[in-house]
Regions:
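N-terminal leader/targeting and accessory segments in enzymes
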Residues: 1-90
Length: 92
């Protein structure tokens, strides 16, 4: 499925890369990322998934959905939204 199809029901800003890419899975648990995944960064009481971006990129994530300001890593699409929890619900 194309990333742009998952994003069509919400407001977002492309920080880097393209939405015209094929994705395999939608995940919010960094341990479950695989090649061509979209990783949605959820900030929790104990940990902040934004901290795991370098790890998921190494695992092959094709795109990252963030709500905080981050420095993009080359070769990965970065999508910024106001609320990543809402974005995850809309994309599911």
């Amino acid at each position: 499925m194309k990333l742009e199809k998952l994003l069509e029901r919400m407001d977002y800003k492309v920080l880097a890369g393209s939405t015209d890419i094929e994705i395999s899975t939608l995940v919010y648990d960094s341990r479950k990322v695989e090649k061509a995944s979209v990783f949605v960064c959820i900030s929790g009481a104990v940990s902040d998934a934004h901290d795991f971006i370098p790890d998921v990129v190494k695992k092959g994530a094709a795109a990252v959905v963030v709500e905080k300001d981050v420095t993009p890593i080359e070769g990965v699409t970065y999508i910024k939204v106001d609320d990543t929890r809402l974005a995850l619900a809309c994309m599911s």
